[in-house]
Amino acid sequence: MKQKAIYPGTFDPCTKWHIDIITRASTIFPELIVAVASNKNKAAYFIWESRNSLLEESVGHLTGVRGVGFDNLLNDFVLEQNAGIILRGLRAVSDFEYEFQLAGMNRKLSKKVETLFLTPAEHLMYISSTLVREIAALNGDISQFVPPNVVRELKKRQNERSL
């Protein structure tokens, strides 16, 4: 039986590695909710609504995929959405340790929720939202790392800051 999955993240901004995970997951799960977190512990570069709309624009063409913002405990959100799977992406060993710990905690919070991991395509494994923001801040070319709509929005933000 195929289940609905939740792919959570801050997506600040969404990158091509996020899009790769979402695209591949959309062929595995009949419904994939990309959950844009309002993480109060992180100072976001883009406001929540912008992150959500950039993501929606980037994956809107995929069947069975929709973006939803959330600001509560992930396990609670997963259960509210009648999903049973949290999908997480792993780029490197450094991601694994943190994600393994989260998966264990989520399992402890609810036996009804499982965590599954996908790795991105090899040529995307080094991309992170943080690195993209740093490159953009120094006027570097980020077009190979993020969708075109994100490039436009980051350039717009940089231009506003330089005024």
Curated annotation (Swiss-Prot):
Here the disulfide bonds are none
A Gene Ontology cellular-component term = cytoplasm
Task: Return the annotated site residues (Transition state stabilizer).
Answer: H18
What EC number(s) does its UniProt record assign? 2.7.7.3
Recorded catalytic reaction(s): these are:
(R)-4'-phosphopantetheine + ATP + H(+) = 3'-dephospho-CoA + diphosphate
Cofactor(s) required, per the database record: Mg(2+)
Which residues take part in binding ATP? T10, F11, H18, G89, L90, R91, E99, L124, M125, Y126, I127, S128, S129, T130
Superkingdom is: Bacteria
Q: Where in the cell is it found?
A: Cytoplasm
- Which pathway is this protein assigned to? Cofactor biosynthesis; coenzyme A biosynthesis; CoA from (R)-pantothenate: step 4/5
**What does the protein in this record do?**
Reversibly transfers an adenylyl group from ATP to 4'-phosphopantetheine, yielding dephospho-CoA (dPCoA) and pyrophosphate.
Oligomeric state and interaction partners are given as:
Homohexamer.
Per the record, the similarity remark reads: Belongs to the bacterial CoaD family.
Q: What is this protein called?
A: Phosphopantetheine adenylyltransferase
Species of origin: Legionella pneumophila (strain Corby)
Gene coding for it: coaD
